[in-house]
Structures are given as C-alpha cells and as structure tokens.
C-alpha cells in the first residue's frame, strides 16, 4: 500500500517547525535575557531568517496585515448577522419577594414578547424613568399639593377643596407633626419602597410619612458608633505616646515596688473607709450597714447575744393517730479510727510460721504417692520430710537415692501380659 501523502506532508510540517525552533534556541542560547539593543536585534534577525528564510521583511509584514484584515471582516459579518437575526434573549431573573410588574420585560424591549397582557413582567417603558431613588426626607403628598394649584381647578374641584379644608371632618381631624411609626419601621427594616402601603390607612393616614430634618436612623447611629470605636491596641499606643520621653523604665524591682505601694494604698483606703463608717455608726448617721459591720463596730454584742439568747426549745405536736417513726442517729466518734493494741486475752492467735511450715500428711491424703506422684502433686512422703530435716540440720539438703533396678525388663514384660489378658467385662 502506498503511503498517504497528505499525512506525510502534515507530519513534515510539524517536524520542520520543531527543527526551526531548535535551531533558534541553539543560535540564541544565553542571549534571550540580555537587554542590549544589539543582542535583541540579533535574536530578531535569526528568528526571521530561520522562519521565513530569505523573504523580504515587507512581504512578511504585508501577509500579517492581510491576516488581520481577514479577522476583522469575520467580526463584521458576525455583527451584521446578529443585527439581522436577533439572538435569543436570556430569561429574566428577579430577587425574591420583588413585584414582577415593577420590572420591564426584556423580550418586550427587543420586540419579541408574544404573551401580551398575560406576561407577568411590565410592558410599560416609562417604569425605567421611575427607578430613581426616593428621598425618605420628603413626603410625596406635599409635592402633589404644591403642584395642584387653583389654575387647574373647575367648580367641582373647588367645592371639594373647600369642603375638605373647612368641613366638619377636617375640623375634627387633629393636626400633627408626628411621624408615622409604620413608616419608621419600614425604613428601619428596609421594607420601604415604591409599592409600600402604610398599614395605618395608606394615603389617608393622619401621620406624616417623612423624616423631620436632622433625624438620624438607628442603623445609621450604630454605624457612627462603630466608626468612633477604637481597638485596644490603638488605645494603648495612644496613651503610651502621650506619656512623653521622661518616664521610668519598667523593671522587675520597680514593678514589685509599685505593686507593694498600690497594695498598701488600697489597705489604707479600706481602713479609712472603715473608720469613717464606724464614726458614722456611733454618731447614728449610718442608716444602712451590714450585720458583719455591726459586730465589727460593737464586738460586745457577740457575748451579749449568747447570754441573753432564749434557750427554750419548742416541739411540734403530732396527732394522736399518727405513729412516731423516730430514727436514732448516732454521731461519728473519731476515736474509733485511732490505731491501738488489741487485748489478746482469751483469743487464739495464729502464729506467723503457718506460712512456712507444713502440716503432717494423713494416710487418706496420700493418693498422689500411691499413683507414683511426687511433691509437685501437692503431697510429700515421710522419707522426703526426714531427709529435709537432716539436710537442714547439716546446712544443706541431700539428694534422694534412686533405685535403678526397681523396674527391670522382666517386670515390664509381666506387666504387659497382665494388661493384655485383663478381662474388661469383669
């Protein structure tokens, strides 16, 4: 199969480009970071020579300009197409709780809205003009009254104004400059706006819906207080800078002396206060004193109280039918916990040698010896005890002699025959 020419050509272009970049790197090695004009000019010439060969620089610049023009033409074409065929308008998003009728429909602006009166957004383009910020220091009704002059009235309107101004209802209605509390709450809670209606009757509300001049809201007061506050570090630096250069340097000795002096001053002040209160108490000026101060000023009252106290004890009587469930209570005697010697008369006391001596074995307890066991089974023979006593008397324990001919080969053979001929049923 013959090779693909297009693939070869594409591959050769990439390889050629890599070769050119490699040649440029080799020839300009160590010169890229040089800031001299000659080095930069040399790098530019080498790059141009390797990439474009012996082409004229004017031709290269012309080809680049043509490429740029082509890009600009493409952009212009796209703009014309967008103007002819209007793109899809993105769906509108409004904040939670906002009235959609207060927002102009984006599709209606582009002339693409097909819903008509069913559209939840407004088709009134004049709403955008009403989006200017409303002043909370001006009542809109005052402006309407200023614009509503007598030049525009007819006879019917004039009669209506006269009745309102001089009628009985107007006379009964009190005049006030008090600001509506609902109006203030709406502003404090950021609920005031174009579509806010006063709960006190809307436009019929008798109170003013405008802040008086110089009135400051609570949220603005908090902001001002926060701005006036300074941090603890700034306060310390400010106080320290106000001391000046002529101050005593703080050392351990000076600090301890200052602390001692302050403590003494505090004690002296407390003593002076106590003397003053004592003098007031004696003169009868001190009307409110604590019980502790009474006994401090007149310590003789402590003994008088003990002597003159009424020692009569009162008991609460119980009914005849009730059962006396009295519980005897014994006080704790601390002398019981004092260690002392025990009287051993008439008491059998175990000797301390019980942990080192062993009791004599009985005949019925020698099962381990009969079965060939030794001292590790918990039993000891008389021979072992005698040998142990003799060894302890001599200062050492001798080894027990072992009879090597106790079990000979003949005895073992006889024992095996007896085991084989043993009748298990019996």
From Swiss-Prot:
Answer whether the UniProt record assigns the keyword Repeat to this protein.
yes
Region of interest (Required for interaction with DRG1), residue spans: 236-260
A Gene Ontology molecular function term of the record:
RNA binding
Specify residue ranges for compositional bias: Low complexity: 1-12
For this record, the Gene Ontology CC terms, alphabetical, are: cytosol; nucleus
Ranges for region Disordered: 1-30, 53-74, 299-326, 358-411
Source taxon at top rank: Eukaryota
Query: Is Amino-acid biosynthesis among this UniProt entry's keywords?
Result: no
Show the ranges annotated as biased composition (Polar residues): 53-62
The cross-references to Pfam families, in alphabetical order and at most eight, read: DFRP_C, zf-CCCH
Where does this polypeptide localize? Cytoplasm; Nucleus
Which parts of the sequence carry Phosphoserine?
231, 351, 360, 381
UniProt GO BP: cytokine-mediated signaling pathway; cytoplasmic translation; positive regulation of GTPase activity
Gene3D superfamilies from the entry? Answer: 6.20.400.10, Zinc finger, CCCH-type
Its transmembrane ranges are: none
| UniProt cross-references to PROSITE patterns, sorted A to Z | ZF_C3H1
Q: How does it assemble?
A: Interacts with DRG1; this interaction prevents DRG1 poly-ubiquitination and degradation by proteasome. DRG1-ZC3H15/DFRP1 complex co-sediments with polysomes. Associates with microtubules.
Describe the family membership recorded for this protein in Swiss-Prot or TrEMBL. Belongs to the ZC3H15/TMA46 family.
Function statement: Protects DRG1 from proteolytic degradation. Stimulates DRG1 GTPase activity likely by increasing the affinity for the potassium ions.
Mind telling me what this protein is named? Zinc finger CCCH domain-containing protein 15
Native organism: Homo sapiens (Human)
Gene symbol here is ZC3H15
């Amino acid at each position: 199969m013959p090779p693909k020419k297009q693939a070869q050509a594409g591959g050769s272009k990439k390889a050629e480009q890599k070769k050119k970049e490699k040649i440029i790197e080799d020839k300009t090695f160590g010169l890229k970071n040089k800031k001299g004009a000659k080095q930069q000019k040399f790098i530019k010439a080498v790059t141009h020579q390797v990439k474009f060969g012996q082409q004229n620089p004017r031709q290269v610049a012309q080809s680049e300009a043509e490429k740029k023009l082509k890009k600009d033409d493409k952009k212009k074409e796209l703009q014309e197409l967008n103007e002819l065929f209007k793109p899809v308008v993105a769906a509108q998003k409004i904040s939670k709780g906002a009235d959609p009728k207060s927002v102009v429909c984006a599709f209606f602006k582009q002339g693409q809205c097909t819903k008509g009166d069913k559209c939840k957004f407004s088709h009134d383009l004049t709403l955008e003009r009403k989006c200017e910020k409303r002043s909370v220091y001006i009542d809109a009704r005052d402006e309407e009254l200023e614009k509503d002059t007598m030049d525009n009235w007819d006879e019917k309107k004039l009669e209506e104004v006269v009745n309102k101004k001089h009628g009985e209802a107007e006379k009964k209605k009190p005049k006030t400059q008090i600001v509506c509390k609902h109006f203030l709450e709406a502003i404090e809670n950021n609920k005031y706006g174009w579509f806010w209606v006063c709960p006190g009757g809307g436009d019929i509300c008798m109170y003013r819906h405008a802040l008086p001049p110089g009135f400051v809201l609570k949220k603005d007061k908090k902001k001002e207080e926060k701005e006036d506050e300074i941090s603890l570090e700034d306060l310390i630096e400010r106080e320290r800078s106000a001391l000046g250069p002529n101050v005593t340097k703080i050392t351990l000795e000076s600090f301890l002396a200052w602390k001692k002096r302050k403590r003494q001053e505090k004690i002296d002040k407390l003593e002076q206060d106590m003397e003053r209160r004592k003098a007031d108490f004696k003169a009868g000026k001190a009307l409110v004193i604590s019980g502790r101060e009474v006994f401090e000023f007149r310590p003789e009252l402590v003994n008088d109280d003990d002597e003159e106290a009424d020692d009569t004890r009162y008991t609460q009587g119980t009914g005849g039918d009730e059962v006396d469930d009295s519980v005897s209570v014994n006080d704790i005697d601390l002398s019981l916990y004092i260690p002392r010697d025990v009287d051993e008369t008439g008491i059998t006391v175990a000797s301390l040698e019980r942990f080192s001596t062993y009791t004599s074995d009985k005949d019925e307890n020698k099962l381990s010896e009969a079965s060939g066991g030794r001292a590790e089974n918990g039993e000891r023979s008389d021979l072992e005890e005698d040998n142990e006593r003799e060894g302890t008397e001599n200062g050492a324990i001798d080894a027990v002699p072992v009879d090597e001919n106790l079990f000979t080969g003949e005895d073992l053979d006889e024992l095996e025959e007896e085991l084989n001929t043993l009748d298990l049923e019996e």
